[in-house]
Amino acid sequence: MRRRLFSMMLVLSLFCLSARAEIDLSTQSPQPTSTPAPVELSGTALLDAPPMALDCAAALLLEPESGQIIFEMNADSPRAVASVTKVMTILLTLEAIDDGRVALDDVVTISESAAGMGGSQVLLDVGETQTVDVLLKSMIVGSANDAAVALAEVLYGSEELCVDRMNERAQQLGMAGTHFVNCTGLPADGQHTTARDVARMSAAMFSHPLYYEYAHIWLDEVDHGDGRVTQLTNTNRLIRLYDGCDGGKTGSTDEAGYCIAATAQRGDMRLIAIVLGAPSGAERFDIAGEMFDYGFANYRLYPVAERGTRVRGGLPVEGGSQGSVAVQLDADLTLLILKGSEQGIQLSPNLPESLAAPVAAGDRVGSVDVVVDGKTVASIPVAAAEDVDATGLPYALRRILSRWPAIGG
């Protein structure tokens, strides 16, 4: 009976939470301290199939704060994605700037290899000098292949070494279906990725504030210093066509079709739309816009729990210096839910009747399951909020023996 009453009190107290926060359910290999943790995508999409007809080869709609996929189509099918490949090149550049390995005002001398790139370019000449700032802008706004290679060379010494790092970073982000061969997305045997993997690296790129200082630019120009000026026009038409769109990377080749990884924000919710293999440039923008419309119209972020929130009543402690210990939520949680479905969220505690002393602050003592429509969608760990020492002769003897100097030599 005592446990039942305690469980009811816990559920009532947890429903009083209102602070908005984000849970980190991801793991990654060691990274520089400024590198954001990868977004951990949910294993199952909220919808079994897209809610509208999508005239493209693959698609995915993601809410990156929760990591929740709203819907997907052929998300794990390997494909060429053309210049959407540059998402990884941009990401590595942003991370290098954050880590202090390069600065925006660093001057780069353009190599023959960079100047000789085909496809979309900003028309750099061999021996020309440009700043990292100009090259990054040219890649984000104009999808310039020559700028991408120039940055790859300044970051890693050569495009080949940059590609090695691209593949390494892809593995760290959990991009199991991806292999890079170049840093531009120009056609190359063996180069492929998936809509799910594009979502992973795009979420990482979109997490950098510096990215948005370039992504919103519609028209600009590059001064080459010899009298030539190259006009830049943003390849992502959605920044002009869709309310809330503030970033994205396009790409197209005969093999890849027309692709885009775009993001839009309305209120406190950001969405990422991945469209691969659309039949035309206009249709990829239309499809992404439809996907955004559905997500913003039907879903919202709901703050469920905040790390450090005390669970009322605490837990009894047997053999302790005090009779109970305060316990608290040990993670934050925000869920993506259908608008109006808040009442369907239930919190179910999984806590022991009591704890045995000693108890240290931070010790995990149980969890609280988050249940939506009868399904457990997340589990929030619960930890001790304070230390409780043990009392009694057996414990005292163990402490004395543990501190006794070793005998012998």
Where are the regions a protein language model picked out?
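Bacterial N-terminal signal peptides
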Residues: M8-C16
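Active-site-adjacent loops and short helices of periplasmic peptidoglycan-processing enzymes
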Residues: E22-R196, R200-P209
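Domain-terminus/edge residues, biased toward the C-terminal soluble/receptor-binding domains
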Residues: M175-H179, P187-G409
